[in-house]
Amino acid sequence: RGEDSPYGDAWSFLTNEEGITNFWRDGLIRNRSFENVITMGMRGENDTAILGADATMEDNVNLLRRVLKTQNQLIRETINENLDEVPRMMVLFTEVEAFFYGDEKTKGLLDEPELEGVTLMLSDNNQGAARTLPTKAMRNHKGGYGMYYHMDMHGGPMAFEWIGSTYLPKLWEQMTAAYEFGVQEIWVTNIGDIGTQ
């Protein structure tokens, strides 16, 4: 990263589309001989919204549509023209979940054609409760659903690291509910790093 880098100097698809696209292309080429589930979408630097706090819902959703279209095109060019044969996922965490559903003024990404065949990774609320589960109408999504669940959290406004704060019966209850609601494609657990004694 830097002025002389082929990836540009900003983690911004809005101001550095060419650099970010080169970064993604090189990553796809570098890893194409391995078994992968490709992560779709984009967040801002340091786990922030893609456009920052001042941007509107519509601005964010429209930029994410461009991101998804670019990513799918890169996958077709470098991995396989048939996207149905390429495992892909998009994590709907914090602000990305809001962009997925949209609001009363802005249609979100819920029925976005670029997400067809992409596993939609739902998440918990950082305290062990699922933020959302797919409605009956949503369960027909071609890519299915997955879960990204925190057993360790480092971030504002609180952090719980290196301690077992997830009550195991609650974990069982939440994951059982998720499974019964069709969240069965991919499960990822954030367990943090290894603490030393």
Name each model feature, range by range.
Residues R1-G2, N126:
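Contiguous N-terminal and early-domain "leader" segments and peripheral loops that mark the onset or edge
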Residues L14-K142:
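Gly/Pro-rich turn-and-neighbor structural signature
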Residues S5-D9, D47-E58, D152-G164:
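Glycine- and acidic
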Residues L122-G128, T135, R139-Q197:
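Structured mid-domain segments that build the active-site/substrate or prosthetic-cofactor binding neighborhood
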Residues G2-R25, K142-Y148, L168:
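Active-site-adjacent "subsite" loops/lids of carbohydrate-active enzymes
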Residues S12, G102-D103, K107, T166-P169, ...:
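General structural signal for secondary-structure boundaries
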